[in-house]
Amino acid sequence: MTQLSLFYQFPIQPIFEGHVRNTLICTEEDMQQLQNLGIRKLRKEKEEIQKNKILKNLLKTELDVLQAHVQTECQKLNTNLRDIENALLLENQKIIPSSETHSVLEESLQAKTVTQVTITQIDPAIHFTENFRPEMIKTFYNNTQMWSYTFGAWFYKLKRAFFTDSKLKRMLKLTYVDSLSITQELLSISINALEQITIYPMHDNLVSDLEAGLCLLTAFFASYPGTFLTENIKFVDVIQNLSQIFRYLNTEILATKNASPQDFYFGFNDPDKMKYFIPLCKGRHYAINTFSNHILIKIFIKKGVIKQVPGDQMSKGHVVIESKLTGTLTDDKLLYWTQILLQPKLGKEVPIFVHQQQYLRSGIVAIESLYLLWQILNSESIFGKRTGKFYLTTIFPHVNAEDVTETEFSSVNIQNFEFLMKNYVVPTYLANNESTISTLFPGLISIVVNESVRLGWDHNQNTLTQTNALHSQTKDNPFVEYIRSQLEETAELAVLEKHDKILFHFENGLNVTLSLALPRHRLFAMASSLFNVADLYDFLYFLVLGFIPVATVI
């Protein structure tokens, strides 16, 4: 029972009522401490503000000084540039008439973006911007919607080899295995494989095979009195005078052959089971006597181009090359001319060919390639009666008859080789100074390699070539293996081994072809049976393009 609530009490009683003694008492000492603490805090904040203000003033002063210095230096630079521009303008006005200045500037700007090459003397020039061969392939396929073309038995065999692999078949867009035509993808990757053969995939490969060969030829040509060589010579000058140099070289080769027929050998004595082109003995040296039997090495030693190849014993009685490096530079002809030709490109990093022997070997192979072309291309006139079915209009349908001229016609003085060097090799090298034999002449690679493969030669069982010996053959195409390894992204060493296998076939094919009395007939027969080549006109374009399309009826 609840208690009775009184009438004067509230319904809800407050909780926690304040105590009567709950009061805050601050003494005077406490108030003084609080006041001092506040004063110190305010003084600290004021000092911090003054410090930041001083730092900002100092930074502004330093920036003003820096700005004034930069303006002064920029004014000096502008003044110097203005003086240089005025001097160049005065010099150009002395050299170029004012009426021709505009056209010369236009030509120089165009030369930076467009390169012009000419293959034969009866055709107009061809312009390209970056990559000559891919642009030709693209142009050809853009203009062939109404026709079907065949490229020869070799490309058709490539198509059949890849057609059985479903993955590669999709990648290369192969259809209709019975059709002789091939896709743009297959042609492009095949030509790309041909272009890579003499490009060695090394990060420290400073000199192309073409440049190495030109250095060797320059040193050889310098051994004759009364030559045109000066210390201002460039690679372009050597290329334009290759015909004259090869006349001297041909005389030496024939003299060596007549004196000792067994010395007429253009090959290398590699040890058995050698897989890679790069030398592995003592740094960058090949095995002993690798160069001993090569006729060009014997000629170079005879003419004093090189004193002795390290590790070889074929030049007894000569001092070793190391002793020559301590003497005057002009005593070593090869090193002297190599430095003159390569110094604008490499500076002081010019390699010594007899010590980094991959340059010596690749240069010799490049000389053999150009020498073979010199023997073949001037065998007949380009203006003779044609038997082939390929014309430039196959790639460029809109070529007019007026574009085909015969202004350089000469019935006695045939200069197909000289014309090709001047109007194709020179502008291509100027556009890309890393050009090699395979990038210049992929067609030559395919013919020579197929000649070596046809003979059944095997680099792993390398012996001196015997003309009276027959070799068994296999159906293996080294290009099929190389292209497949690239498409399937095989390990780098495996791809390199297949690449070098083709390179060794190319070396052996050159040895076999140059050893023949009439190399032209052998190469033309091979090109005719595999690549649709019927005459010299076809052969010239096949050397450069790597393919000859001929219209076919389905």
Swiss-Prot record:
Alphabetical list of InterPro entries matching this protein: Herpes_UL25
Pfam families on file: Herpes_UL25
Subcellular location: Virion; Host nucleus
Annotated disulfide bonds: none
One GO CC term, this protein: viral capsid
Keywords linked to the UniProt accession: Capsid protein, Host nucleus, Host-virus interaction, Viral genome packaging, Viral penetration into host nucleus, Viral release from host cell, Virion, Virus entry into host cell
GO biological process, one term: symbiont entry into host cell
Subunit description: Heterodimerizes with CVC1. Interacts with major capsid protein/MCP and triplex capsid protein 1/TRX1 at the pentamer vertices. Interacts with the large tegument protein/LTP.
Family from the record: Belongs to the herpesviridae CVC2 protein family.
Its job: Capsid vertex-specific component that plays a role during viral DNA encapsidation, assuring correct genome cleavage and presumably stabilizing capsids that contain full-length viral genomes. Participates in the interaction between the capsid and the tegument through interaction with the large tegument protein/LTP.
Protein name in UniProt: Capsid vertex component 2
